Regions:
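A structural boundary/capping signal
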Residues: 2-161
Length: 161
């Protein structure tokens, strides 16, 4: 069993905690989990995002805009601690995210490049901390995790101190 928590803060104090409790996937199933993540990427996960450099790409490229929360979801869904968040600047000057285990790359959204005849920016990649205060998981990542977990999800609970 594994817990992933996201705290909400007010005046630097925790005022709410969302906790997903679930049965994580074994590392040996990482390719299957990547496919599950890909199958669950939908445009509603991008609602409210202001940081997309090319918003019209969402209409023609299923994977565009999903690299961060896909990578973060994969990181938390796996039953291991050897996946490193990585990012690099792509051919259009946009940041792209993926995970690595040594030299092995796990990229849920690489097809956004490959389908255009381009290469993901692995050659410019570096270890990168998750965004946000205290590197907490994004709500979008938790929503994607719930979709992927299906019957592996034990609970999704919001508590207040």
């Amino acid at each position: 069993m594994k817990n992933t928590q996201r705290h909400k803060y007010k005046d630097k104090e925790i005022c709410e905690t969302r906790t997903l409790t679930f049965d994580p996937y074994p590392y040996s199933e990482i390719d299957q989990v990547i496919r599950l993540i890909q199958d669950n990427l939908t445009s509603d996960l991008l609602k409210g995002r202001k940081s997309l450099m090319y918003p019209s790409d969402v209409l023609t490229n299923k994977y565009y805009g999903h690299c961060y929360h896909s990578s973060q979801a994969l990181h938390y869904l796996m039953d291991c601690d050897i996946l490193t968040p990585m990012s690099g600047e792509d051919y259009r000057g946009e940041k792209h995210w993926w995970l690595q285990d040594g030299q092995k790359i796990y990229d849920c959204t690489a097809k956004q490049y490959l389908d255009r005849g381009e290469h993901p920016p692995y050659n410019t990649g570096k270890k990168t901390n998750w965004y946000g205060w205290k590197q907490r998981p994004q709500q979008i990542s938790l929503t994607l995790m719930k979709r992927v977990l299906d019957d592996r999800l034990i609970s999704d609970i919001v508590t207040k101190p």
